[in-house]
């Protein structure tokens, strides 16, 4: 009885890992986000937040890193005025914590995330550089991330490769705690 379910799970993992390779993928030779996120018209807010928190050095020099980058539309849906409040605050610790929750140490391509989920019976957990857990599971063909308070974000563009990292665009802002 156990063998058929194992075969089904392994087959599903194989098929899902193949589907990731069909997604759009970009490669940049520069280091991570500060030069390349701004190239995307839909990542202006996260670039502004990186500059405001002075996290450019971390992103340009550290690595390997995985960044789950919310689109501008995701930030706009996040909260009316909250992003502006965080960007304009003198104390940038809350904004820095929020950004840190979107970064995981290590080079996690979509296929590595899928393999971790296969090993975890459909679920995987990663520790962000902020120190909190970020869970991943599948919903159809999508990798879905879940934060500690239950918010979810889908990876909409996977494996934007950088010299020292990989970026996955997500459709929602995830949070380490309620803001």
Show which residues each predicted segment covers.
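Mature, structured domains of secreted/extracytosolic soluble proteins
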Residues: 2, 20-179
């Amino acid at each position: 009885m156990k063998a058929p379910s194992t075969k089904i799970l392994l087959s599903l993992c194989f098929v899902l890992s193949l589907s990731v390779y069909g997604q759009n993928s970009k490669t940049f030779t520069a280091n991570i986000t500060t030069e390349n996120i701004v190239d995307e018209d839909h990542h202006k807010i996260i670039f502004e937040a990186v500059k405001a928190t002075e996290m450019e050095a971390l992103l340009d020099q550290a690595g390997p890193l995985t960044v789950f980058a919310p689109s501008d539309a995701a930030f706009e849906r996040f909260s009316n005025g909250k992003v502006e409040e965080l960007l304009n605050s003198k104390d940038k610790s809350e904004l820095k914590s929020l950004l840190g929750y979107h970064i995981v140490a290590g080079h996690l391509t979509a296929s590595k995330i899928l393999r971790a989920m296969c090993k975890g019976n459909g679920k995987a957990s990663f520790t962000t550089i902020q120190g909190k857990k970020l869970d991943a599971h599948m919903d159809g063909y999508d990798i879905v991330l879940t934060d500690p308070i239950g918010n979810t974000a889908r990876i909409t563009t996977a494996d934007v490769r950088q010299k020292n990292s990989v970026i996955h665009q997500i459709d929602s802002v995830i949070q380490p705690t309620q803001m």
